[in-house]
Amino acid sequence: MEPKERELAFGTDGVRGVANRGLLPEDALRLGLAAARRFGGTVVIGRDTRLSGGMLSSALAAGVASGGARALDLGVLPTPGAAALAARLGASAAGVVSASHNPYPDNGIKFLSGEGRKLPQRTERELERLARDPFPERPVAGGVGRVEALEDAPEMYAGAVLGALRPEVPGLRVLLDCANGAACAVAPRIFRELGVQLTVVGDAPDGTNINEGCGSTHIERLEVAGHDVAFAFDGDADRVLALDERGRVVDGDRIIAILARDLKERGRLGGGAVVTVMSNLGLLKALESLGIPCEVTPVGDRHVAEAMLRVGASVGGEQSGHIIVAEHATTGDGIVTALALLDVMARTGRSLSELAGVMEVYPQVLVNVRVERDGGAGRVAASGTVERAVEDARRELGERGRIVLRPSGTEPVVRVMVEHEDEEVCRRVCERVAGVVSREGGGG
């Protein structure tokens, strides 16, 4: 039997769990009530296509109304769509029910500010504290909030996107994979408005097939033959990966390089680009050779977004395809990113394969080392033995490579990532350091 009051903790992308087991409707109600107490006003609520989405978004809306705020249900809509409409409608916050690229039994709840941006961690901690209060004072009579639906939310979001970015690409042959997720509600109509020759797959959501053998996590399954470009979204459409006309993957690193170079050439670069420590070394080298300032952050779209605001960067993101194009979006938006790429193709007359040549991808080896010693991954990574092994590796790799050691924040794992021009050197160094980490972590 479930305990009456469970601890709700925000991770890197909201509160997550298996729906109806690790994440209950009661949890959603408590989070909605906490949001009403923290933000007031109107909280817009969007969701992806998971079977549990209606259940959890209804409970979230009930919590918001119980706290005296107005809940505006956007229905199935990409996360960046909820962000954009929160800002456009003057909402105090946006709530999104989604587990992104995870399988359908999982779900999650995250919040964005009224400006459509990631919440600071201190605000999430405040929501956690408010959600722990089992019996807050609640309004009655006329103080109870309303739950309303915005039926034309997809049309409003599509209009906002096309009003900001409308590449001239009539006749271009485009393949879209909507991951049987939130992109289905809006991406096809946006691309058809552009007059492209459109093929759409992953556009038959049934509540259980989101991300199943489709979308950005399975982009290698797409058959791009007969198309000029393909785009694959994740479940809530805040990321996108591309395939060029030859069927080669254009990941987030290459997309950032393409967009950053174009922005620089047009004098719209601002404070440069923001990437993470796990971005490919080839991206860092490419940006340096182009004279583009680059800020490197820890992994996580929150860190990227905060750094972009701090330095005034125009583009930033992660290899996974979670990319923020600051001129057109406040958070990662797969559809906006795809349109920005099409815009570069249209203005330059170059194919995506030509544009992707802006950077050379360095061979990369990543090993996840499970640790068993008390103190967890952080203590193992900071041990003198491991630090000496990392320093030895840095000396061997020199200017032609690098090593990144990153303890996981969610599991007892240390990630060892090595990049080098020579793949054999890359593999050898990574395996050696991973062995040291394993022995230090009690793995033998």
Swiss-Prot record:
Catalyzes the conversion of glucosamine-6-phosphate to glucosamine-1-phosphate. Its EC number is 5.4.2.10. Signal peptide: none annotated. The keyword Phosphoprotein applies. The gene is glmM. Its cofactor is Mg(2+). Keywords: Isomerase, Magnesium, Metal-binding, Phosphoprotein. One of its GO terms (cellular component) is cytosol. The modification Phosphoserine is found at residue 100. Mg(2+) binds at residues 100, 234, 236, 238. This is Phosphoglucosamine mutase. It comes from Rubrobacter xylanophilus (strain DSM 9941 / JCM 11954 / NBRC 16129 / PRD-1). PANTHER family: PHOSPHOGLUCOMUTASE (ALPHA-D-GLUCOSE-1,6-BISPHOSPHATE-DEPENDENT), PHOSPHOHEXOSE MUTASE.
